[in-house]
Amino acid sequence: PEMRRACAVEAARLRRLMAESDDAPGPLVHELHACADVAERRGVAVDIETVGALPAVPADVRRVISDTAIAILTTAVSQVRVTLTALPEGIAVSLVADSPAPPPRLAAALGIVLEHDRDCRNLWVEARWTR
């Protein structure tokens, strides 16, 4: 299982790298959809929603946020909900999943703050970026 998870993480990162070079409106949403594909291929239901007009997010910040999402998407059992919310000062990306894994660790860098919580079954993680 651990080897499969590691392969899924790298497959999601490759998909994200390919999505980074696409000229798409809303590159973060586009990259998260590419990362979600790996979970969907395992039968995990992934729902990605946006709230508000998302600001431009630098590539290095998008990479950290999508790495956080990949960590959750590759360990989810059956469902993940991703919500991207535009904030006056940046963006918040919230993920809720039935993942048994511990929350991903993130070094405080690039103005990103990571919060998490867990109930019996679900893991909630929010990455908040401030410009």
Kindly give the residue locations of the regions a language model identified:
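Acidic ATP/Mg2+-coordinating residue in the GHKL
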Residues: 97-98
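DHp/HisKA dimerization-phosphotransfer hairpin of two-component histidine kinases
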Residues: 1-47
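Conserved ATP-binding N-box helix of the HATPase_c
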Residues: 56-81
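Short active-site-adjacent structural elements
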Residues: 90-92, 103
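Short, non-transmembrane amphipathic alpha-helical segments
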Residues: 35-38, 65-69, 73, 103-113
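Short beta-strand/loop element within the Bergerat-fold HATPase_c
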Residues: 81-90
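ATP phosphate-binding glycine-rich loop and adjacent ATP-lid/helix-beta elements
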Residues: 101-130
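Conserved catalytic submotifs in the C-terminal HATPase_c
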Residues: 49-55
